[in-house]
Amino acid sequence: MLNISKIFEEVKVMKNFTLNFGPQHPAAHGVLRLIVELESENVVRVEPHIGLLHRGTEKLIEGKTYTQALPYFDRLDYVSMNVQEHAYSLAVERLYLDSLDIELEIPQRAKVIRVLFSEITRVLNHIMATTTHAMDVGALTPFLWAFEEREKLMEFYERVSGARMHAAYIRPGGVAFDLPMNISEDIYKFVIQYRKRLEEIEDMLINNRIWKQRLVDIGIVSAEEALNYGFTGPLLRGAGIVYDIRKNYPYDDYDKYDFKIIIGEENNSYTRFIIRMKEMYQSLSIIEQALNNLRPGLIKLEGVNITAPDRAFVKKDMESCINHFKFFSEGFIIPANENYTIVEAPKGEFGIYLNANDTAKPYRCRIKAPGFLHLQGLNMMSKDHLLADVVTLIGTQDIVFGEVDR
């Protein structure tokens, strides 16, 4: 005789399903590994595992001179190269110039070139962020359109520095080289043409029914949560908080440029997409203003230790040749001092704490990357959403693991 009660005793209780996501997953933005706990297809918990791209950057910098350390910053967020060079150059300048009894200011032309390429970098980043996000969700066409435009911006990098990505162009005291002939006209033509391309991408995505269904009400973050988690950039401004370092704590004369801080109301994935799209329009406006502000002049400080001798003199004068060699091999000494410098990177607040100790090498360099703070909020943003929405949320955070793992 069949014992029904015994059968029911043997039925096991269903437990939550644990899934390993990445690090090989194409939507993992590099080397992100997530341990996702699911109840059916609903997310209960997301645990990010980081460190797979850790290279010990902060420790490596301690063994390099202030000049030799600069290229490390290109390799943190490798989509926003010049902005990080900008932050490091400002940090070194402030450390060095604070130690002098005289007041020195970076030449005006150098400041304008820095702003110009920082905003070109912001457009580079947002092109990557918005269109790869669209590709992760399933829209391939915007990605193909935008990367055609991104190639043109990479060519501007190459024309000023010789490198498409790791330019080492913005340096303490100014910039490495002056702008080559006709590049200003070409950048201006790009701005005019890219505005039309942006409108085409907006037409494809902004009112797209499927795109909105995948993004609206996904990953809502309140203003209080954004502040508690240390969010900055589009993730903070999406909550309606007006915070942009270019406006709040201007550097390199950003206060002289006319642009708006784009904020949102409902801080969901769709809001953050709109913010990044509108920020590209603002960056194009700043680029135009910078081109109009370009005047003949010096591109770096002269007569100070933090800039290399001009190459024109190196080939004519033995003393300049020796100074040039010693500048790159031995570096320059900065008296004991410390500072914390922040810039508005495309992803948020990028900060550098530098500590000098009367040597030619930093005693300590601490890097604050926005992506590291954003990633810790992924669990909070993912709860009660579907597994497919986790891919959307990784995209809306715009994570790059060079800066997260360092």
Curated annotation (Swiss-Prot):
Record text on subunit structure and interactions: Complex I is composed of 45 different subunits. Component of the iron-sulfur (IP) fragment of the enzyme.
Membrane topology: Peripheral membrane protein
GO molecular function annotations of the record: NAD binding; NADH dehydrogenase (ubiquinone) activity; quinone binding
Keywords linked to the UniProt accession: Electron transport, Membrane, Mitochondrion, Mitochondrion inner membrane, NAD, Oxidoreductase, Respiratory chain, Translocase, Transport, Ubiquinone
Recorded superkingdom: Eukaryota
Protein's cellular compartments: Mitochondrion inner membrane
Pfam families per the UniProt record, alphabetical: Complex1_49kDa
Database matches in InterPro entries: NADH_Q_OxRdtase_suD, NADH_UbQ_OxRdtase_49kDa_CS, NDH1_su_D/H, NiFe-Hase_large
Protein task: Core subunit of the mitochondrial membrane respiratory chain NADH dehydrogenase (Complex I) that is believed to belong to the minimal assembly required for catalysis. Complex I functions in the transfer of electrons from NADH to the respiratory chain. The immediate electron acceptor for the enzyme is believed to be ubiquinone.
Family designation: Belongs to the complex I 49 kDa subunit family.
GO biological process: mitochondrial electron transport, NADH to ubiquinone
The species this protein was found in: Dictyostelium discoideum (Social amoeba)
EC number: 7.1.1.2
Protein name: NADH-ubiquinone oxidoreductase 49 kDa subunit
This protein's GO CC annotations: mitochondrial inner membrane; respiratory chain complex I
Chief localization: mitochondrion
